[in-house]
């Protein structure tokens, strides 16, 4: 019964529809194939078999039903293509299903119209006079802007920091200030990506940039656009610790919004110590060069100003000093004149010998005394008789023969004095390296030697070495004292324990006696 009633209703509805279509007048002329005019529905024309309805402030064509002109509608226009039932839009062909042809920026374009079956705008439909735009990652309805001759992006004019992109069929100026992802159909867009409808499917696309995005300039990804006066300029972006590159020994910190590379405190202290060590070493080397030049100049003075005879005499006397033979000392004493030899023996008192020993003991090191050319000159002047006699072995024998009468009576004194002088010379003699430069530093050299000059100032390296040696010696002394104290404490503990043990042993004996 129900199926029968339903079939009757369908038959009645079909008969009414056919009658209504036959009674519709599409203007002048016959059917669609002969160029009949359709009903203007908003900004487009509905084909035959469709109904023009108003939804959410927009005129849309519904397939089937009655074709009625809405209030305020206008009839007119000619469809092209005959039975295609679609209008050519801008010379590019007919629009797709769900699109309508409209003018944007003075040109006809196919755009999607929002209806209850079409794309929504952020979960809602836009009213008449509004367009759907993407702002800060959120779809929303905004008023359709008035057409402007200055527009550079459809009906809009994009600023230097905006992107021109098509959203829902409209060219729009957009920029992304957010960083949170947002939903786009079945996808998730990440700024600066934008959500657009492509082929009836919402997709995430990257925004195209205009040629000049900073006034009349173009800023790349490493620069940012700032306003300066009446114009715009591209300046480098402020780096963060994520983009700034530091060396291996440095770390990145943010200071007043800028990323800076610094050295950690521990590494900085170590680097300061290394730099101080290098500075001290360089200063020591710089100070050591003038001292070496001064010493070399002082050593070179006697050789430059000295006479050839004196230089030869010094070389002759250097050889016996290296060999240090006692015979040469005896020969020197024998070659001395009889009067001088006797006077030397008479005045060689113990007090003078002691004074000579004290003078030699308080003498400066060889490194300081080597830089005294005066001693060499005095030594050479007083050693002239020995130099002349040493160069003539024949005169040496003659001198011995002629000196026999004078030395015959003084033989005991000479023999007694010889061992003492020879031993004193050997005891107070300096190392061979130093005595080689001073062959005749015997009684004559010691008597006529001038007072020692003040020692040269120590360099920083020598001072540091002396301080290091002093600290090592002090540390060794303290360690030795601690060791001695430990030994004493151990001995005292041992004695105390022995006394306590002896007392404990003595107590039972006294108790037994009692």
Swiss-Prot record:
InterPro entries reported for this sequence: Fol_N, Prespore_vesicle_assoc
Alphabetical GO biological process terms: cell differentiation; sporulation resulting in formation of a cellular spore
Annotated stretches, region: Disordered: 285-514
GO CC list: spore wall; vesicle membrane
Disulfide bonds: none
Signal peptide residues on this chain, from the entry's feature table: 1-18
Biased composition (Low complexity): 328-391, 398-413, 424-457
Biased composition range(s): Polar residues: 285-297, 480-508
Follistatin-like domain residues: 40-62, 240-262
GO molecular function: cellulose binding
Stated name of the protein: Prespore vesicle protein
Organism: Dictyostelium discoideum (Social amoeba)
